[in-house]
Curated annotation (Swiss-Prot):
Source taxon at top rank: Bacteria
Matches recorded under InterPro entries: P-loop_NTPase, T4SS_component
MF GO annotations: ATP binding
Protein name (database record): Uncharacterized protein pXO2-09/BXB0008/GBAA_pXO2_0008
Positions in coiled-coil regions: none
Taxonomic lineage: Bacteria, Bacillati, Bacillota, Bacilli, Bacillales
Length: 644
């Protein structure tokens, strides 16, 4: 760095320079102007000069040019001399009229005619409608600590804006002047720096360009999660409804270590503070510390208690929970029972994949008849009210009771030998559930006052070590229980709201968290997929939502070329209101596009692999997308230990 002598310092001070101020703000390490870039002590800089604009300028066009990540943009605007503008237009009109008759190719004559019409309209707006013409200079200053990376970024930005019909270039041997324009007015640039006049534009085009916009999200009753790329607060309430935000579910994608679990815990902690009911599944045991500090419960569905911190409990697979509602918001008893029969049938199907449709039909028939004999379901033609949900746990049969029923069952006369074999196969399967997995399947529900607990997480690590079929059975049972709790809370809140006895601030919401959700929804778990999809559709009316998190769609989708139907999984994603994309690997982008469609722009897809840890593209609605840096404080990170 050059050090000035005393005489030089005195000279500059006499001329009015504040040398102390300059010393504080000057580039540390000095500055050197090279042919195509500027070298500073800590980075390299290049000025990309926009020298040609699109023929048809769209709304918000300046935003696209001046809101590039890690750049500084400048726009210089001056008012053009009206007489000179009109004179230039007249000259151009004369030239275009000549081209309309002299050009040999018809396409060139058509182009000249089109340009003439545009120019004539422009001239009329100036002379008759009071349009004011502005002169505009647009510059994008790109910086990077690595010269090669700077050159790559210049190429990327040029390619991006070229796709919108703008042209830009780094002016060779002009980098010093381009740097100085940052500190000079438009008139000084023209007079002292030898800069050419700006690009003429109607003032209305600048008006709807809106380049210097500021993004923030400040939901009433929201949770502070981080800051937007423009420094605005990002305060999100997933239960806040607007004209474009109509449901309460969300999806989080991001590779390992990108910040998925930390974000979910930020959200969970904020919702707990709002007195929201929380339910979730934890496979990696990431939530133990958080849930314990909040006074919640962790339940191991495997029936094995390997820690004092964890409760074990049985959920009776034959207990009927309320999972269906009518249009008035009441429990649909018959619909809930039919869905319950479907759930138990699928449990049997998963436990024995060799059962064909005939065996399954036989099982369903006997199960339905068993509930009639037990007294829960009225006989056909009976005028007895249909009531199967909401009874105490010991009011329901257990698998052992069903096995006794099957053992005493006599098929009607004339039943085929195949039906007898099917009945024996069903009895054998139920007996296996009782003897081998009795701790999980054979007994009344033992979780007391479970539905009134604010925070409950199911540890599915234990059951994930069992056969896939057993895992699915317990998973579906837990999902049914969660659905029942959400319905009960939602119906109460809905009734109080409709009776105007509860303000929106006092509503108690219900949120389900599915971290590492590929363990639950995937191409091999179609029943769970359909169950979760139905939950999404129904729960919106009852102040409930569900948040999913996984590394990429590849974790859930079948391999390329598979004939497995993935429409249900795509529907689950499409129904989510909030879509959050943390850093993702290049290799999954094509799969992501196949699932997302046009949810993100091409430029947003391209920056996903470049996002820093904790940084995300957040889509709140079809018209609202934010670039957010989530920033939990040190105390939160200490509480969130385990999972990032």
């Amino acid at each position: 760095m050059v050090k000035l002598g005393k005489k030089e310092q005195q000279k500059y001070r006499t001329e009015g320079y504040d040398l102390d101020f300059i010393s504080r703000v000057q580039p540390q390490g000095g500055i050197k102007f090279n042919e195509k870039y500027i070298a500073q002590g800590d980075c390299y800089v290049a000025c990309l000069h926009v020298y040609s604009l699109a023929e048809d300028i769209p709304p918000l066009w300046l935003t696209a040019l001046m809101n590039n990540k890690d750049t500084i943009s400048s726009v210089d605007v001056a008012t053009a001399n009206k007489e000179e503008v009109v004179k230039d237009i007249n000259r151009s009109i004369t030239e275009l009229k000549d081209r309309m008759t002299s050009e040999r190719r018809s396409t060139d004559r058509d182009d000249a005619h089109w340009e003439l019409q545009n120019l004539t309209d422009f001239a009329r707006s100036i002379t008759q409608q009071g349009e004011i013409v502005k002169l505009v200079k647009l510059r994008i200053y790109i910086y990077d600590p690595v010269l090669e990376q700077l050159e790559k970024r210049i190429g990327d930005i040029k390619k991006e804006i070229a796709g919108q019909n703008y042209k830009a270039q780094v002016y060779v041997f002009k980098q010093k002047e381009e740097w100085q324009t940052l500190f000079a007015s438009y008139d000084d640039q023209i007079e002292y720096l030898g800069v050419k006049s700006g690009y003429p534009l109607p003032s209305k085009n600048i008006g709807f360009g809106i380049p210097f916009h500021h993004q923030d999200l400040k939901d009433p009753r929201g949770i502070y999660l981080g800051q937007t790329s423009t420094g605005g607060a990002f305060i999100l309430d997933p239960f806040f409804s607007t004209g474009t935000r109509t449901s309460f579910s969300g999806f989080i994608f991001g590779k390992m270590g990108a910040g998925k679990s930390t974000l979910l815990k930020q959200l969970e902690e904020g919702l707990v503070a709002k007195d929201c009911f929380i339910r979730g599944f934890d496979k990696a045991r990431d939530y133990y510390t958080v849930v314990q500090q909040q006074g919640g419960k962790i339940i191991d569905l495997s029936g094995v208690q390997d820690s004092e911190e964890v409760e074990t409990g049985m959920i009776n697979p034959l207990e009927v929970f309320a999972t269906k509602i009518t249009n008035t918001g009441a429990v649909d008893e018959k619909g809930s029972f039919i869905q319950h029969i479907s759930k138990v049938t699928n449990m049997i199907r998963f436990l024995n994949t060799e059962f064909d449709d005939t065996v399954i039909q036989e099982f369903r028939k006997h199960l339905y008849a068993f509930y009639i004999e037990w007294g829960l379901v009225p006989q056909k033609g009976s005028d007895r009210p249909y009531k199967v949900t909401g009874y105490p746990p010991n009011h329901y049969p257990i698998l052992e009771d069903f096995y006794k029923y099957l053992s005493n069952l006599k098929l009607e006369a004339g039943a085929t030998p195949q039906r007898h074999r099917d009945l024996e196969a069903i009895k054998l399967q139920v007996e296996d559930m009782i003897t081998v997995y009795g701790d999980m399947f054979n007994g009344h529900t033992t979780l007391k006052n479970f539905e009134n607990e604010q925070i409950v997480f199911f540890d599915i690590d234990g059951i994930s070590k069992y056969d896939k079929s057993v895992f699915n059975c317990q998973l579906f049972t837990a999902l049914t229980l969660i659905w029942s709790h959400a319905l009960k809370n939602g119906r109460q809140m809905k009734y109080l709201r409709e009776e105007k006895n509860l303000s929106i601030e006092d509503v108690k919401y219900f949120m389900v968290f599915l971290d590492e959700c590929h363990n639950v929804i995937n191409s091999q778990n179609e029943f769970a997929n359909r169950y979760v999809l139905e939950f999404e559709r129904e729960m919106r009316k009852f102040f409930a939502g569900i948040f999913f998190a996984t590394q990429s769609p590849q974790e859930m989708l079948p391999p390329p070329g598979s004939t497995v139907d993935v429409s249900t999984m795509k529907a689950i994603f499409e129904l989510t209101q909030y879509k959050i994309f943390l850093n993702m690997d290049n290799s999954v982008l094509e799969t992501l596009k196949s699932v997302l469609g046009e949810s993100l722009t091409e430029s947003e897809f391209r920056i996903l692999p470049e996002l820093k840890r904790g940084e995300a593209i957040v889509q709140v609605s079809s018209t609202e997308t934010y670039n957010v840096m989530f920033d939990p404080d040190e105390k939160q990170l200490e509480r969130f230990k385990g999972g990032q």
